[in-house]
C-alpha cells in the first residue's frame, strides 16, 4: 500500500490530534512531526501531547506508520564541545521516549557534523553518542538520514552511514531515511539511474534498513552539496524521477514524506503545497501550473 504524507505541525493544545487533522486534510495516510520546535529542545511533557485523541483520529482516517524527526540542534558528531555532545545524547534519549509514547517506530536523525575535525573523528563521535543513547530493548529505531554533504555534515555517502551502523553495538536499532534531495545533492544519480543507486544502497547498507523516504525536489544540480528543497517537479530531480521513487515496488511499504517548501512570496500568506503534490504524485501527471494554483487557492 502506498504510504504518502508530509511534514505537519504538532503544536497548541491539539498536538497529535492537530497533526493528524492537518495530515488528513492533505489526503495523507502517514505523516512526520517534530515533537516541538526543530531549532530548540523545549518540549511539553508526554501527557500534554494529546496522544489518545490523536491516535483515535488517525485510526478513523486509516493513518499509521507516522515518523518523528529529531531537532536540528542535536549534534552528536561534535568532538570539540563536550556540552553539545552531551546535550545531544540526553535529548535523543528523551526523544526516544516521546516517539514511543506517540506510537511511532522511526525517529529521523541527521547523523551529525564534525565541525572541522574531519569525517573520521565525527563518525567516531556519532558512534559513541548512539552507543550511549540506544537502549537494547527499545522498540524505536533511529533512522539516520542521508545527507547532502553541506558544511561538515557526516553521512554524505552510503559508506559513511554504513561505517556508523557497523560501529554501533545495538545496530538493530538503526535504520536509514533516504532523502531524495540530499542524495541528489550528494552526487547520486537518482534522476537517470535510481535502480542503480538503490542497488548500491542495498550492497553497502542493506535495503531492509531503508525505513523512511523524504520526497523532495532539489533547487541545485547533482553533486552541489547544498541541500535546498524544491517543490515536486520544479527542481533538478523532476517529477518523473520522484514519481518513480514514490511508486517503486521495492519501497511499497516505506512511508514517503514530503518536506517541500510552502508556496508564496509573502511569509504571512505562504501556503502548504502538500494536498496538491500528494494528489499529483498519486495520479501520475505533472501540472506545470501547480504553484500558481496553490498561490491562488
UniProtKB/Swiss-Prot annotation:
Single GO molecular function: DNA-(apurinic or apyrimidinic site) endonuclease activity
GO terms of biological process kind: base-excision repair
Entry-linked PROSITE patterns: AP_NUCLEASE_F2_1, AP_NUCLEASE_F2_2, AP_NUCLEASE_F2_3, AP_NUCLEASE_F2_4
Xref: Pfam families: AP_endonuc_2 (PF01261)
Superkingdom in the source lineage: Bacteria
Catalytic activity: Endonucleolytic cleavage to 5'-phosphooligonucleotide end-products
Entries under PANTHER family matching the protein: APURINIC-APYRIMIDINIC ENDONUCLEASE (PTHR21445:SF0), ENDONUCLEASE IV ENDODEOXYRIBONUCLEASE IV (PTHR21445)
Stated name of the protein: Probable endonuclease 4
Organism the protein comes from: Listeria welshimeri serovar 6b (strain ATCC 35897 / DSM 20650 / CCUG 15529 / CIP 8149 / NCTC 11857 / SLCC 5334 / V8)
Amino acid at each position: 500500500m502506498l504510504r504518502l504524507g508530509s511534514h505537519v505541525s504538532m503544536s497548541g493544545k491539539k498536538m497529535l490530534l492537530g497533526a493528524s487533522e492537518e495530515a488528513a486534510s492533505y489526503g495523507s495516510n502517514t505523516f512526520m512531526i517534530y515533537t516541538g520546535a526543530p531549532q530548540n529542545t523545549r518540549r511539553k511533557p508526554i501527557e500534554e501531547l494529546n496522544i489518545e485523541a490523536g491516535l483515535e483520529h488517525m485510526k478513523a482516517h486509516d493513518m499509521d506508520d507516522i515518523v518523528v524527526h529529531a531537532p536540528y540542534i542535536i549534534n552528536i558528531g561534535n568532538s570539540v564541545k563536550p556540552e553539545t555532545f552531551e546535550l545531544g545524547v540526553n535529548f535523543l534519549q528523551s526523544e526516544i521516549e516521546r516517539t514511543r509514547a506517540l506510537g511511532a517506530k522511526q525517529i529521523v536523525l541527521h547523523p551529525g557534523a564534525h565541525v572541522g575535525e574531519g569525517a573520521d573523528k565525527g563518525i567516531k563521535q556519532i558512534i559513541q553518542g548512539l552507543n550511549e543513547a540506544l537502549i537494547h530493548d527499545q522498540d524505536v529505531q533511529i533512522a539516520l538520514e542521508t545527507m547532502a554533504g553541506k558544511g561538515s555534515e557526516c553521512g554524505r555517502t552510503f559508506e559513511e552511514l554504513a561505517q556508523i551502523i557497523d560501529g554501533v553495538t545495538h545496530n538493530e536499532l538503526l535504520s536509514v531515511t533516504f532523502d531524495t534531495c540530499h542524495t541528489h545533492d550528494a552526487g547520486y544519480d537518482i534522476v537517470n539511474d535510481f535502480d542503480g543507486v538503490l542497488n548500491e544502497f542495498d550492497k553497502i547498507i542493506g535495503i531492509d534498513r531503508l525505513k523512511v523516504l523524504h520526497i523532495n525536489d532539489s533547487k541545485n544540480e547533482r553533486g552541489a552539496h547544498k541541500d535546498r528543497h524544491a517543490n515536486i517537479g520544479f527542481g533538478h530531480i523532476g517529477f518523473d524521477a520522484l514519481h518513480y521513487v514514490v511508486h517503486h515496488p521495492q519501497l511499497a511499504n516505506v512511508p514517503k514524506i514530503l518536506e517541500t517548501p510552502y508556496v508564496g512570496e509573502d511569509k504571512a500568506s505562504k501556503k502548504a503545497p502538500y494536498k496538491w503534490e500528494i494528489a499529483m504524485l498519486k495520479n501520475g501527471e505533472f501540472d506545470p501550473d501547480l504553484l500558481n494554483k496553490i498561490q491562488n487557492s
